[in-house]
């Protein structure tokens, strides 16, 4: 059975061999970070990543960064609190109404962003793709390969959560427009994830956000008309206005992809221009290529 859901593919990436002498040893990383133009939030984030993380091969995506103890399996205010505040400031500057976060791995930091920015967030849950009833998934669902090698999975929002959150937003916007001849229902959505790799997931979530938002607002407007005598014409517009993430792999050109597709520049704590497996190291824009504290540290 061919699923009617939108399907996205992730290209595999390989690591780049780097001469050992070009890598700043972990023992010298503090000095390099202090001399960098990174913000306070990005400096603390990088120190935490180098201390608890490493690099390794992932079954579903090739060479990548293992950062579970920083962003997925622990909450470390000493390393990420300042970055969360900076990202929340960006969300507020973009006048974000709603945040979408894909999968459980992105939700810890996504929830932190949401609370810091005082913005409601929706988790796009990951489910195994089943052939029994491919039409059973809610609006905005899509299929994408799992980064951990589990095969194709379906990402979708909780319809009950969507309904309540969007209803609250729409009610506020309607209350602000009681004297207007035309109702303008604009929903400004942002995305958040623990990392932006090739922007495949970012594109999928952004396109999903428009579908989710338009359907939910349409239902809210119909309910409003049923309950009131309001028959004013209405315009519905859902736009993706921001992406926030601790990490972005700039060597995969995700910034260019998001600009071309959505005319937005993602906000990232650390811009990574290369990832090395042997020895484990990452190239960080503004700092250089820096080694991790321990080989194979922080696996999950």
Describe each PLM feature range.
Residues 96-103, 244:
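Short glycine-rich phosphate-binding loop at a beta-alpha junction
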Residues 103-109, 197-199:
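Gly/Ser/Thr-rich loops at beta-strand to alpha-helix junctions
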Residues 16-96, 156:
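Active-site-facing substrate-recognition patch
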Residues 98, 188-190, 242:
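Structural motif
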Residues 4-13, 18-37, 208, 212-300:
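PRPP-dependent phosphoribosyltransferase catalytic core
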Residues 104, 126-128, 248, 271:
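Short, ordered loop/turn segments at secondary-structure junctions
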Residues 118-189, 199-203, 283-286:
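Short, glycine/charge-rich flexible loops or terminal/linker lids adjacent to PRPP-binding catalytic cores
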Residues 108-118, 204-208:
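Short Gly/Thr/Asp-enriched flexible loops that form oxyanion-binding sites at enzyme active sites
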């Amino acid at each position: 059975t061919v699923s009617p859901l939108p399907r996205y593919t992730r290209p595999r990436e390989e690591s780049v061999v780097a001469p050992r002498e070009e890598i700043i040893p972990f023992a010298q990383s503090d000095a390099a970070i202090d001399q960098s133009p990174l913000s306070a939030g990005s400096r603390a984030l990088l120190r935490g990543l180098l201390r608890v993380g490493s690099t390794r091969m992932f079954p579903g995506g090739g060479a990548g960064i293992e950062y579970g103890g920083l962003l997925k399996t622990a909450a470390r205010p000493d390393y990420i609190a300042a970055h969360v505040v900076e990202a929340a400031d960006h969300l507020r500057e973009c006048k974000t109404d709603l945040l979408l976060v894909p999968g459980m791995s992105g939700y810890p930091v996504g929830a932190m962003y949401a609370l810091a920015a005082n913005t409601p967030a929706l988790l796009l849950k990951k489910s195994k793709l089943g052939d029994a009833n491919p039409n059973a998934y809610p609006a905005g669902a899509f299929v994408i390969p799992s980064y951990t090698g589990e095969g194709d999975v379906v990402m979708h929002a909780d319809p009950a959560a969507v309904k309540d959150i969007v209803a609250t937003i729409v009610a506020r916007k309607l209350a602000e427009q009681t004297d207007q001849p035309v109702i303008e229902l604009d929903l400004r959505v942002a995305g958040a994830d623990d990392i932006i790799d090739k922007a495949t997931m970012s594109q999928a979530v952004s396109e999903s956000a428009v579908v989710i938002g338009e359907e939910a607002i349409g239902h809210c407007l119909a309910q409003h008309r049923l309950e009131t005598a309001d028959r004013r014409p209405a315009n519905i517009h859902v736009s993706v206005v921001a992406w926030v993430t601790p990490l972005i792999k700039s060597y995969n050109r995700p910034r260019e992809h998001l600009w071309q597709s959505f005319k937005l520049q993602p906000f990232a704590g650390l811009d990574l221009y290369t990832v090395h497996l042997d020895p484990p190291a990452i190239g960080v824009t503004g700092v250089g290529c820096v080694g991790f504290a321990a080989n194979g540290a922080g696996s999950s």
